[in-house]
Amino acid sequence: VKLLFRRRLFSVGVAIGALTLVGAGIGTAQASTAQHSRPASVKPTVVLVHGAWADGSSWDKVAAKLQHDGYRVVTPPNLLSGVDNDAANLRAYLDTITGPVVLVGHSYGGMVITNAALGDKQVKALVYVDAYIPDQHDTVYSLTSAVPGSVFAAEASTVFDQVAIPGGDPHYPNLYVKPSVFGKAFADKSIPAKDVAVLAARQRPLAYNALVEEAGAPAWTTIPSWSVIGKQDAVIPAAQQIAMSKRAKAHTIEINAPHLSMVTDAGAVTNQIEAAAKATN
């Protein structure tokens, strides 16, 4: 897949006139135009990283809008295996992309992009959508429980179904959100119940260790960041998202949306991503 280019050519007319009297006649003015071009402005590739208990399809509405607007979009799988491993895999994927990148993370995806982008000169902007924006040593657990209001701050056995990983540590199982909790956590009443049921059915598990692994040095100290905050978020309370966004000096918008704002408010999310993309030019 090749990068899309937008070329802008500017013409500067340089008129060279010659006026000569020949008997009773007058010579006509002659004009010529020289073409001058500026370097092409390259739209960045937008990399959309999904969060826990989801897959790349959670970005479908946003991806379609970005593609309509001329952006190359990719939604690589997030392994949901732990911050370090997930960041390493994303970093390897980013290495295959030529040209500037806008890196977008939803929810747990924010943990991953913050670690994966560190030192990557191709990543020109970070965009956090209802996401964790960690500093060094932060964990998903510590950020989730920092302020009241998260559904996931409850006793784990009331929120998650636990499935042992064959050959793995029994204390670190895969976690699935209970169907009875899924809608309350992710969608509120903004998504029809039948659609919530489908999302819950196809959820991908998050490894328990992903909740407690510490983040490394954050990329947002050197890469400008943007954020979208859903004010009805029941996973990461809006107050916590605001605090993290301020700490990262992110360009922030707040919208009336649940945790899945890219599903319920794809237009607002797309606009914020494109604002970040335009700022990279």
Segment roles from a protein language model:
Residues V263-A279:
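Post-His helix in hydrolase/transferase enzymes
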Residues Q122-V123, V127-D169, A207-A210:
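Flexible "cap/lid" loop of the alpha/beta hydrolase fold
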Residues V104-G109, I113:
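Gly/Ala-rich beta-loop-alpha elbow adjacent to hydrolase catalytic centers
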Residues T221, S227-I229:
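Short beta-strand/loop motif that positions the catalytic acidic residue
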Residues V198-A219:
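Active-site nucleophile elbow and catalytic-triad environment of alpha/beta-hydrolase enzymes
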Residues G230-A257, V263, A276:
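Conserved loop-alpha-helix segment in the C-terminal half of the alpha/beta-hydrolase fold
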